[in-house]
């Protein structure tokens, strides 16, 4: 099972997504793919911040389609994820490093559900010891 990061969903929502993303998504069994509530918040914020117009309307419609498609596969930042976030964030802090947010929250959700993560930005996820798939390079 795979948690899709915000950058992957954002790319898939474009009018012309990268061919590698389209191919990778087409090859996955839909029931194995999940979103996080954090990704939904990031997408809603990004769309909400746009000026009124066709682009905003198209992205709003695309997000509505994503929400419908993933209705039963959206994972929340719950108490289990909060515990994992705290565990994961303490280690880098002790080493004098930061732990990113919101990627840290997405990492914690994936870790609490034992999911791999599909993302272009792999650093936070690999640092947490998660299995990471980069669909932009998966075919390479």
List the predicted regions and their residue ranges.
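Short, well-structured N-terminal submotif of metal-dependent ribonuclease cores
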Residues: 1-35, 39, 48-65, 139-140
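A generic structural signal for short hydrophobic patches within well-formed alpha-helices
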Residues: 9, 40-43, 82, 125
């Amino acid at each position: 099972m795979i948690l899709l990061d915000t950058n992957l969903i954002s790319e898939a929502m474009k009018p012309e997504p990268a061919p590698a993303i389209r191919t990778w998504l087409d090859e996955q069994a839909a029931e194995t793919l999940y979103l996080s509530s954090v990704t939904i918040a990031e997408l809603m914020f990004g769309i909400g911040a746009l000026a009124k117009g066709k682009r905003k309307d198209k992205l709003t419609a695309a997000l509505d389609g994503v929400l419908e498609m993933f209705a039963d596969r959206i994972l929340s930042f719950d108490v289990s994820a909060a515990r994992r976030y705290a565990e994961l964030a303490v280690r880098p802090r002790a080493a004098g490093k930061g732990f990113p947010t919101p990627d840290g929250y997405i990492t914690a959700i994936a870790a609490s559900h034992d999911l791999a993560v599909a993302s272009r930005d792999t650093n936070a996820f690999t640092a947490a010891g998660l299995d990471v798939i980069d669909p932009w390079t998966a075919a390479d």
